[in-house]
């Protein structure tokens, strides 16, 4: 798998190669600058229509981490972290996935990333 090897060359011409482990790659991802946290509460007919599954599927196309879960009051809560532009595109991707017909209201709030997620998961 040569595509996984990282090149650590210097201007001196000396080349070093290494195969990073998962923890190393995760540390690199967590150090990205301009990371933000987006929390969205979706209202409408958003439970029982595959909303969480679709949100997780859409998340695979973006560099975001987070969770999506049903709330007892009938809403769905989505919390995601990543670059702000990526988060905006992700939320737009959710709307364009066919879920916009079920959403009556979308309450979005922004904050600083807490780096508490690994991947994107459905919370049950």
Residue map of PLM features:
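Intrinsically disordered, low-complexity, mixed-charge
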Residues: 4-124
């Amino acid at each position: 798998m040569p595509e996984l090897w990282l090149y650590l060359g210097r201007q001196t011409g000396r080349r070093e190669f290494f195969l990073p482990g998962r923890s190393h790659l995760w540390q690199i991802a967590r150090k990205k600058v301009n990371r933000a946290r987006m929390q969205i509460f979706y209202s409408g007919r958003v439970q029982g229509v595959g909303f969480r599954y679709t949100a997780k599927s859409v998340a695979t196309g973006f560099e975001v981490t987070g969770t999506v879960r049903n709330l007892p009051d009938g809403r769905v809560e989505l919390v995601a972290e990543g670059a702000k532009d990526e988060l905006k595109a992700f939320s737009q991707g959710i709307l364009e996935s066919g879920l916009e017909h079920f959403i009556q209201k979308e309450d979005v709030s922004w904050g600083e990333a807490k780096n508490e997620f690994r991947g994107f998961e459905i919370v049950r």
